UniProtKB/Swiss-Prot annotation:
SMART domains: AAA. This is Fidgetin-like protein 1. The lineage of its organism: Eukaryota, Metazoa, Ecdysozoa, Nematoda, Chromadorea. It catalyses: ATP + H2O = ADP + phosphate + H(+). InterPro entries: AAA+_ATPase, AAA_lid_3, ATPase_AAA_core, ATPase_AAA_CS, FIGNL1_ATPase, MT-severing_AAA_ATPase, P-loop_NTPase, Spast_Vps4_C. Residues 17-26 have a biased composition (Basic and acidic residues). Residues 1-117, 223-249 are annotated as: Disordered. Its main location: nucleus. Belongs to the AAA ATPase family. It holds the Pfam family AAA. It is found in: Nucleus. GO terms for biological process: ATP metabolic process; cell division; positive regulation of mitotic cell cycle. The gene is figl-1. Residues 76-93 have a biased composition (Acidic residues).
Length: 591
């Protein structure tokens, strides 16, 4: 058994030399020893060991487990020797290796400058290389006919092409299916396939019609014939490809500049809103210098609160409340109609407060003001001016008044204003306090012009909970009390206009006595209940009876309805409203 020689390893072969000591001076680096012996799993090269003389295998050790091939003959080399690059140290004898013929494999042989193949094999490989250069796809004609997936796909295609199965036994049909499969695989594996597809229109048409050529009876899932392309040819290309006598189907649209505004694009495409209202308003508001520091979502939220009054409500529709209607005409309608007269001391107040028990018509008066004032009407609630983000509520209040001042004359109606401007205390949250402060500053502050036509109309059921600073800014505080007897009679007449009834003046007097203490909402509920009296008498005949056969509403229906509908306002609450009106109200008591 011979001991392999110790070699110096450099950094080019991926290993470092083990440092020499007295203990390991006679040892060899383990990977090197394994590589020299030919048993290393990482060794993929061929040993190049110099054979010296006729040493026997017993003296030099066993032969390596792989064959050694003679190197190409060079001028200075022995034709039967194999050389390994080592140091200048003395070589130890290596075993003689018997010459073995290389094993033939099915893989393609490697050939190059230092090939160990025979001349016949080299000639055969060169011929294959020449054939490959001429037609590089001859070696890719693999037969996948027996593959399981290909068989399944072929069966599905056969079911489509031959659903009855009559041609399954035809050898020509089977051969066609097999050849089509191989042809499709060969086309798909061709790297020039995409280049051929995009070469020209003729090639596209040829490739698009491949399916129809292979399967002439093929139909799509919808039962239609396959189309070559689902995209329409542009008009300029189509017109150029046709004759000069053919005219285009439609005119081409002019090219729109990139910097064109969205509103112009929408109008050109016929997608603008009715009159361009909201988009034009939003674009106009964006250009205002006073709104540039507001976010777009804040301006959009305020714009959404602008109320468009479709149903015209007149002062005659509001029963009673003559003092409140007269005061509102002087405050809202007349100054907006003649702003040149109402200047200086005649300038209308900035804030009007409507207070009273629930159901007395405060909200309806606000709708009437919006209809009669011909002004921009903002219908605001407490939720419109609050946000979960800190500082967002103050911005909403400031944006509300900024937009209202840009759209003068304006009316801001806030229902249930006590939830927004309640009395400030130490226990309330800081954000709520800031919103109230901002509202009061915007309503009557340093930047408020004395002659601007901006009115804040508030309605509340709890005036005693308002902050004292807010109470001062509402110069006109109008008490909307319960309807008087004559007002209740007028409410009944107004509600019965579209219903058949037999109510006379004598019956109205009786209804007036029955409804003492009723509010306007209670009177409406009473009339609704009385109108359902004739319907309840019909019973199951409601599906077949004629509309004209339903009897009219009588005073008996009101009497029966009065037993169900009761007044909702307590007398103690009325006393509290009367006391607050006596202390802070601005309407003189009725004569």
């Amino acid at each position: 058994m011979y001991s392999p020689k110790r070699v110096k390893l450099n950094l080019t072969n991926g290993m470092r030399k083990r440092p020499e000591t007295e203990e390991n001076r006679g040892e060899l680096y383990p990977p090197t020893a394994m590589a020299r012996n030919g048993i290393s799993p990482y060794f993929i090269g061929k040993p190049r060991r110099k054979i010296v003389g006729d040493h026997k295998a017993s003296e030099a050790g066993p032969p390596p487990p792989f064959p050694l091939k003679p190197k190409r003959k060079e001028p200075d080399d022995d034709p039967e020797s194999i050389v390994i690059d080592e140091d200048d140290e003395e070589d130890e004898p290596a075993p003689q290796v018997e010459k073995r013929e290389p094993k033939k494999t099915h893989n393609r042989p490697f050939f190059g400058e230092k090939s160990s193949l025979t001349a016949t094999e080299l000639e055969t490989a060169k011929k294959e290389e020449v054939v490959k250069k001429k037609d590089p796809f001859t070696m890719r004609g693999f037969d996948f006919g027996s593959d399981e997936k290909v068989v399944k796909i072929r069966d599905k295609i056969c079911d489509i092409v031959d659903p009855t199965g009559a041609r399954r036994s035809d050898p020509a049909f089977i051969q066609q299916m097999h050849s089509n499969t191989l042809k499709g695989i060969e086309v798909a594996t061709n790297p020039k396939f995409k280049q051929k597809r995009t070469a020209n229109n003729k090639n596209r048409a040829a490739i698009g019609s491949t399916l129809g050529t292979i399967y002439p009876n093929f139909l799509t899932a919808s039962g239609q014939e396959p189309q070559k392309s689902k995209f329409q040819i542009p008009l300029d290309r189509q017109s150029s490809s046709q004759s000069n006598h053919s005219q285009p189907i439609r005119k081409t649209l002019p090219e729109i500049p990139r910097r064109c505004s969205n509103s112009l694009v929408k109008k050109a495409m016929g997608m603008d809103t009715d009159g361009g209202g909201k988009d034009e308003r939003m674009d106009g508001l964006r250009s205002e210098p006073t709104l540039k520091h507001f976010d777009e979502n804040i301006i959009s939220l305020i714009e959404s609160e602008i109320m468009s009054v479709n149903n015209q409500i007149g002062w005659a529709d509001v029963a009673g409340l003559e003092g409140a209607k007269k005061a509102l005409k002087e405050i809202v309608v007349l100054p907006f109609q003649r702003p040149d007269i109402f200047t200086g001391l005649r300038a209308p107040p900035k804030g009007v407060l409507l207070f009273g028990p629930p159901g007395t018509g405060k909200t309806m008066i606000g709708r009437c003001v919006a209809s009669q004032a011909q002004a921009t009407f903002f219908n605001i609630s407490a939720s419109s001016l609050t946000s979960k983000w800190v500082g967002e509520g103050e911005k909403l209040v400031r944006a509300l008044f900024s937009v209202a001042r840009l759209k003068l004359p304006s009316v801001i109606f806030i229902d249930e204003i006590d939830s927004l401007l309640s009395a400030r205390s130490e226990s309330e949250h800081e954000s709520s306090r800031r919103i109230k402060t901002e509202f009061l500053v915007q309503l009557d502050g340093v930047n408020t012009a004395p002659d601007e036509r901006l009115l804040v109309l508030g309605a509340t059921n709890r005036p005693q909970e308002l902050d004292e600073a807010a109470r001062r800014r509402f110069q006109k505080r109008l008490y909307i009390a319960l309807p008087e007897p004559d007002s209740r009679t007028q409410i009944v007449e107004n509600l019965l206009r579209g219903t058949r009834h037999e109510i006379t003046d004598h019956n109205l007097e009786k209804i007036r006595r029955l409804t003492d203490g009723y509010s306007g909402a209670d009177m409406r509920q009473l009339c609704t209940e009385a109108a359902m009296g004739p319907i309840r008498e019909i019973g199951d005949q409601i599906a077949t009876i004629n509309k004209d056969d339903i009897r009219a509403v009588t005073v008996a229906d009101f009497t029966e309805a009065a037993r169900v509908v009761r007044p909702t306002v307590d007398d103690s609450q009325l006393d509290a409203y009367a006391a607050w009106d006596k202390k802070f109200g601005c309407l003189p008591p009725p004569l």
